[in-house]
Amino acid sequence: MNDIAHNLAQVRDKISAAATRCGRSPEEITLLAVSKTKPASAIAEAIDAGQRQFGENYVQEGVDKIRHFQELGVTGLEWHFIGPLQSNKSRLVAEHFDWCHTIDRLRIATRLNDQRPAELPPLNVLIQINISDENSKSGIQLAELDELAAAVAELPRLRLRGLMAIPAPESEYVRQFEVARQMAVAFAGLKTRYPHIDTLSLGMSDDMEAAIAAGSTMVRIGTAIFGARDYSKK
């Protein structure tokens, strides 16, 4: 077993243990392998170990990887864009990715809707919440959620699937859980209006257990799978 396969197995075991501790089924939680700055060869190792969902933060880098595996004839992969999205890059996301986690304004959602090719299924989207109210983070306030969700839900080439957040780092589990619960409550409220939504993208390596206990359905794990990132190669 190579390092990436070993790391994936360890992460899956942690997800399973965290789910079991709070009475949830591990199958309720999707592992999104964050492969930003990592070479296609590392992703190939993860694919060989059974991983199919990958997250990318940089548009062109992600598109290059998507094309690489398409040219190799690899099927069944699911590509998630999880970085801040500029208007001038929206077409590439609309044309190549399966998911976009970072919807935080109607203008971007409308562009993605208009640019999604007719031959592809609707683009799965999550609305990003700035749950810790950090100036450095993208996302909307919870008070803005209802209005944006209603507008996004009307766009036919997008499929609203739920919410995403990147909470501020917290060292204490209790505080991690409190913040994650705020997101879970917002997600539950949204689900009463849009019963089809099913995805709360919340939790990374340091707060995964608290996020799962609060109700996360998708955790985003990078370094614990692929090792430290080299941002000089992005």
UniProtKB/Swiss-Prot annotation:
Inactivation phenotype: During the stationary phase, the deletion mutant exhibits a completely different intracellular pool of amino acids and produces a significant amount of L-valine in the culture medium. The log-phase mutant displays slightly decreased coenzyme A levels, accumulates 2-ketobutyrate, 2-aminobutyrate, and, to a lesser extent, L-valine. Also exhibits an increase in the levels of isoleucine and valine metabolic enzymes. The mutant also accumulates gamma-L-glutamyl-L-2-aminobutyryl-glycine (ophthalmic acid).
TM ranges: none
Any one GO MF annotation of this record: pyridoxal phosphate binding
CDD domains recorded: PLPDE_III_Yggs_like (cd06824)
Keyword Ion transport tagged: no
InterPro entries: Ala_racemase_N, PLP-binding_barrel, PyrdxlP_homeostasis
Modified residue annotations for N6-(pyridoxal phosphate)lysine: K36
Keywords noted in UniProt: Pyridoxal phosphate
Gene Ontology CC annotation, any one: cytoplasm
PANTHER family attached to this UniProt entry: PROLINE SYNTHETASE CO-TRANSCRIBED BACTERIAL HOMOLOG PROTEIN, PYRIDOXAL PHOSPHATE HOMEOSTASIS PROTEIN
Family: Belongs to the pyridoxal phosphate-binding protein YggS/PROSC family.
Task performed by this protein: Pyridoxal 5'-phosphate (PLP)-binding protein, which is involved in PLP homeostasis. May have a carrier function to deliver PLP to the target enzymes or a protective function so that PLP does not inactivate essential lysines in proteins. Does not have amino acid racemase activity.
UniProt subunit comment: Monomer.
Protein name: Pyridoxal phosphate homeostasis protein
Gene giving rise to this polypeptide: yggS
